[in-house]
């Protein structure tokens, strides 16, 4: 912890279940670099911590921006927090930052909520003098986030939706493959999004030996120090911890099948937590109604 008060200064709903909050956290803002994340505890009485990548930071104002999707109990609690309220804790910045240097051509692929952590990385490569192509994927146009911010600096911007309601009707791997096949192909690809998307982005880039592929993994975390082992992943023949060794890894070395299996194992637990939370909310609403 670092003494910041973690007050929510702004709250914006980007789509049906995606929110952006600006939090007062001067110490985190001063130290944050692209690719790093924080562990957030919403309620002191409910101690679960969740990893959220820092989407933006303003060291002068002492603020950080977090973009998250309402999928489980903690993110639901966070989505309900009003402006002016405080989070219990924001631990960070954690993880190894992205190694930003001037590259010939970088293609950054963001899928769904993964667009948020991809944004500062793509922007940093642009500011370093790299040519940057941005590919964004979403199920439909209502779920596209941060498009104006990305278009502002991208040398090439490609939007894909599953239903064709905006941009191309395609998966992100389709334009990614086309770009890799160009004569002026990228020397680096960065993919951030659902694990299955990153797996197939890696498979798309893998045949092109002269193109690096980096992925940013988002796994279960508890302490952020590697002691709990909840975030362990197999990278090549070794066990690594996302919180201290990542979150970025060479996509070609990630054991995607074992990681996906571990993530699936936690879903029934998260569903039960959400069901309990909904029951408590309904009971509280019923009690308030009876007191009227």
Where are these regions (language model features)?
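Ferredoxin-reductase
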Residues: 2-85
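Structural signal for conserved beta-strand scaffold positions within catalytic alpha/beta enzyme cores
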Residues: 10, 56, 159-161, 215, ...
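A generic structural signal for residues embedded in beta-strands
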Residues: 40, 89-90, 233
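Short, Lys/Arg- and Gly-enriched loop/turn segments at beta-strand edges
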Residues: 46-54, 94-101, 243
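FNR/FR-type flavoprotein reductase catalytic core
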Residues: 73-222
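Local cysteine-cluster metal-coordination motifs and their immediate loop/turn environment
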Residues: 117, 195-196, 218-248, 277-281
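Short Fe-S-cluster ligation motifs
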Residues: 244-245, 249-292
């Amino acid at each position: 912890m670092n003494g910041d008060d973690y007050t929510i200064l702004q709250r914006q709903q980007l789509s049906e279940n995606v929110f952006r909050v600006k939090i007062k956290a001067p110490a985190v803002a001063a130290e944050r670099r692209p690719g790093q994340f924080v562990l957030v505890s919403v309620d002191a009485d409910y101690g679960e911590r969740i990893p959220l990548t820092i989407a933006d930071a303003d060291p002068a104002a002492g603020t950080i921006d977090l973009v998250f999707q309402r999928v489980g109990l903690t993110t639901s609690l966070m989505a309900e927090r009003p402006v002016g309220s405080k989070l219990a804790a924001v631990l960070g910045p954690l993880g190894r930052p992205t190694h930003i240097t001037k590259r010939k051509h970088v293609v950054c692929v963001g899928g769904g909520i993964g667009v948020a952590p991809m944004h500062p990385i793509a922007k940093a490569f642009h500011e370093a003098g790299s040519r940057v192509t941005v590919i964004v994927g979403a199920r439909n146009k209502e779920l596209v986030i941060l498009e104006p911010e990305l278009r502002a600096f991208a040398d090439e911007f490609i939007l894909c939706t599953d239903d064709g309601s905006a941009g191309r009707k395609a998966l992100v791997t389709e334009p990614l493959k086309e770009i890799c096949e160009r004569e002026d192909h990228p020397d680096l690809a960065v993919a951030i999004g659902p694990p299955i998307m990153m797996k197939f982005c890696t498979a798309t880039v893998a045949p092109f030996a002269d193109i690096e592929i980096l992925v940013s993994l988002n796994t279960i975390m508890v302490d952020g120090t590697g002691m709990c082992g909840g975030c362990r992943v197999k990278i090549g023949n070794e066990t690594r911890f996302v919180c201290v060794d990542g979150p970025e890894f060479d996509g070609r070395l990630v054991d995607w099948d074992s990681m996906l299996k571990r993530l699936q194992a936690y879903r029934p637990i998260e569903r039960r937590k959400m069901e309990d939370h909904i029951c408590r909310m309904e009971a509280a609403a019923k009690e308030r109604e009876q007191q009227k």
